[in-house]
């Protein structure tokens, strides 16, 4: 599998598809999200963006799941992230994130029952805990 990425441009508050990453020069080539076939690419520096990797999985509606996405799983909001110690994408329920020992779950066991409802950058209200 070739890893896919998307990027959040901090200053523009804009989500885009990543078409190329240059680790030597620390630049990322981007296109408007969903329009990589006919877009005009531009390059941005690493420190101008938040880079998010695709999990390689799709939700129950066939939508690609990226780290930073917020999914609905059995009526609860959960954040998708990378767990380095276990080399796996996980989800943690948003209402438990403030707990010191918040439970995490491997995404590969639940992705077909999840639905992507937004992400932490474009939909910060989903990130908030009510109560």
Residue ranges and their predicted role:
Residues 1-131:
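Secondary-structure transition motif
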